[in-house]
Design a protein with these regions (language model features):
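Active-site entrance/lid segments in N-terminal catalytic domains of soluble metabolic enzymes
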Residues: 1-204
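Active-site/ligand-binding-proximal alpha/beta "capping" segment
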Residues: 190-226
Length: 229
C-alpha cells in the first residue's frame, strides 16, 4: 500500500496533531494544501469534537485525521493537585494571573461514548496514541471502513501494533515533541532517534511506516522516504 492508498492525499505528509494548541483551522489548511490535516481530540469533549468535525467537513472535502489518546486514566489525587497548585502559586502571582487548574484529567481516552458521537461521520482516518483501544472498540472503528494507525516508539511496539491489525504505524522518534506514545514500556532508555527507529521498523513490519519526529524541511522528508517510510 502506497501513501496515496493509505492517506488519500497528494503528498506523503501528515500534520502532527497538537492537543491543546491547535483547532480545526490548521487541519483544514493542511488538507487543502494536499497533506493530511489532523484534529487532536484527546483534550476535547464530545460536543467540541462534533463541532470541530462539522467545521472541517464544511470547509474541505479532502481527507482528514482524527487523533485520540488510549491511555489509562489515573485516579484523581487531591493531595497531589494541592501540591501542584501551591508549587505554581508564586508564578501565577508574579504574572498577576488567577489560578485556573482544572480538577481531574483534561485528557480523555477514546471510548464507546466518543465512538457514538463520531460514528455518523464515518471518519476515513483515525490515529491513536499510547497504544490502541480495546479489541471490541477497535473492531467497531474498523467496521466503519476507517483506516487506523497508531504510534510506536520502539520496534516491539511496532510489531505489537501490526499484530492488532493497524493499517499503518507511526514511528515516533526521540526528536518528536509533545506526548511520547510509549505504551509497552515506560523506560526512556528504550527510546530511539528517528533514523534508527524507522530503519528497524521498516525491516520488520509489512504495513506502511510513517516517520515522526524532528522533520522540518524537504530534506528531512526525502531522507525518511529513502529509509522506507
Amino acid at each position: 500500500m502506497n501513501y496515496r492508498e493509505l492517506l488519500g492525499t497528494d503528498f506523503p505528509i501528515i500534520q502532527a496533531p497538537m492537543a491543546g494548541v491547535q483547532s480545526s483551522a490548521l487541519a483544514i489548511a493542511v488538507s487543502e494544501a494536499g497533506g493530511l490535516g489532523s484534529l487532536p481530540c484527546g483534550m476535547l469533549n464530545t460536543e467540541k469534537i462534533i463541532n470541530e468535525i462539522e467545521t472541517i467537513k464544511g470547509s474541505t472535502s479532502k481527507p482528514y485525521n482524527l487523533n485520540f489518546f488510549c491511555h489509562n486514566l489515573r485516579p484523581y489525587d487531591e493531595n497531589r493537585q494541592v501540591i501542584w497548585r501551591n508549587t505554581l502559586q508564586p508564578y501565577f502571582a508574579e504574572l498577576d494571573s488567577e489560578v485556573n487548574l482544572s480538577l481531574g484529567s483534561t485528557r480523555v481516552p477514546f471510548s464507546h461514548d466518543i465512538a457514538d458521537a463520531i460514528e455518523r461521520f464515518s471518519p476515513e482516518f483515525i490515529s491513536f496514541h499510547f497504544g490502541l483501544p480495546n479489541k471490541d472498540l477497535l473492531k467497531r472503528v474498523k467496521s466503519w471502513g476507517t483506516k487506523v494507525v497508531s504510534s510506536a516508539t520502539t520496534l516491539e511496539e511496532a510489531i505489537w501494533l501490526e499484530s492488532q491489525g493497524v493499517h499503518g504505524i507511526i514511528a515516533q522518534g526521540l526528536e518528536a515533541g509533545g506526548h511520547r506514545g510509549m505504551f509497552l514500556t515506560d523506560k526512556i532508555s528504550t527510546q530511539l532517534g528517528l533514523v534508527s527507529l524507522v530503519s528497524q521498523v521498516v525491516k520488520q513490519v509489512k504495513v506502511p511506516v510513517i516517520a515522526a519526529g524532528g522533520i522540518s524541511d524537504n530534506n528531512g522528508v526525502r531522507a525518511c522516504l529513502q529509509l522506507g517510510a
